[in-house]
């Protein structure tokens, strides 16, 4: 991944003894200007994080950081949200909102340029989202990756594939395709689909964290075929356990996953009812079939090498301590 020299990044710094992906300057600046530094440092005051939903991925992000969740964005220190929807929501209220927006999106921001507020207190979770908003003239302060909080469990590898995702407005996660392609290869019974489409075996947000990780651990490969991802936490969670992703090599996946990539064949804006417009990528079904067959016939040495690389990559996303986060 090529990084622009103009990007305000300083990776690998440490803040209060913990590894940080983001500029410590951003975090300290945000805390100091709100006159809360001493309280955070002493652990007296929890960081309040606004999330726009319940039982959703943004809520999980806040939980992994040990933030105190609020649904009042005017009372939040950090806002974990889709930046397109957030900036549309606060238009006209910019002077009343002070939170540091930590965002990722699958929407095509260009389509909503005139509907979004101008707001400079923003960091992104992925470089492709950073570049998307930079092109629109936003002064994004930096990039901080999402974190995971894995549970290391031991399970017999009795499944080949697993996937997890919730598709809204259209099948962005390609769950129906996963159901179809695994049936085509006669391995649907060796596949776990956690989601809301594709004849799912489990619903998305009704599993405990341990149950979710046990399903990951039972599988050899994670099918990460989403047409678009602002970041993409589930395959990274699976990677922490050595599960190898077979993934569309685009959007947030391109910078975050290691495993078996599938090249995208097209990139475009897809609109649902002329209201919800997403930046999406298609994949080659022919190449997908090739890589599914590759996974089914892979040798032990090759698999173990890919599995180790996946685990090594995922280590960079594990929060340094369960008592703190990069925002302290």
Curated annotation (Swiss-Prot):
EC main group: transferase
Originating organism: Sulfolobus islandicus filamentous virus (isolate Iceland/Hveragerdi)
Keywords carried by this UniProt record: Glycosyltransferase, Transferase
UniProt xrefs under Pfam families: Glycos_transf_1
Signal peptide location: none
Transmembrane spans: none
Protein name, UniProt field: Putative glycosyltransferase 41
Record keyword Transferase present: yes
EC number, UniProt record: 2.4.-.-
UniProt gene name: SIFV0041
Family named by the database record: Belongs to the glycosyltransferase group 1 family. Glycosyltransferase 4 subfamily.
Domain of life from the UniProt record: Viruses
Keyword Transferase: yes
One GO MF term: glycosyltransferase activity
């Amino acid at each position: 991944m090529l990084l622009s020299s103009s990007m305000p990044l300083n990776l690998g710094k440490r803040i209060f003894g913990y590894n940080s992906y983001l500029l410590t300057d951003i975090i300290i600046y945000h805390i100091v200007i709100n006159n809360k530094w001493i309280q955070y440092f002493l652990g007296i005051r929890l960081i309040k994080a606004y999330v726009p939903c319940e039982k959703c991925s943004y809520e999980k992000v806040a939980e992994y950081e040990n933030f105190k969740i609020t649904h009042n964005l005017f009372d939040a220190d950090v806002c974990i949200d889709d930046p397109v929807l957030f900036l549309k929501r606060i238009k006209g209220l910019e002077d009343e909102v002070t939170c540091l927006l930590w965002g990722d999106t699958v929407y095509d921001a260009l389509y909503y340029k005139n509907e979004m507020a101008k707001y400079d207190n923003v960091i992104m979770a992925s470089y492709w989202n950073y570049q998307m908003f930079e092109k629109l003239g936003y002064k994004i302060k930096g990039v901080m990756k999402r974190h995971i909080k894995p549970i290391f469990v031991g399970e017999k590898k009795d499944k080949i594939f697993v996937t997890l995702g919730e598709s809204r407005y259209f099948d962005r996660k390609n769950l129906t395709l996963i159901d179809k392609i695994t049936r085509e290869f006669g391995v649907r019974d060796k596949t776990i689909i956690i989601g809301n489409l594709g004849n799912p075996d489990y619903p998305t947000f009704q599993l405990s964290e341990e149950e979710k990780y046990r399903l990951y651990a039972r599988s050899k490969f994670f099918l990460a075929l989403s047409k678009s991802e602002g970041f993409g936490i589930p395959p990274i969670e699976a990677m922490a356990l050595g599960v190898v992703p077979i993934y569309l090599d685009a959007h947030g996946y391109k910078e975050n996953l290691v495993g078996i990539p599938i090249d995208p064949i097209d990139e475009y804006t897809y609109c649902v009812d002329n209201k919800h417009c997403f930046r999406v990528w298609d994949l080659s079904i022919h190449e997908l079939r090739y890589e599914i067959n590759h996974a089914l016939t892979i040798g032990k040495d090759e698999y173990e090498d890919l599995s180790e690389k996946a685990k090594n990559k995922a280590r960079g996303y594990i929060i340094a301590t369960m008592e703190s986060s990069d925002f302290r």
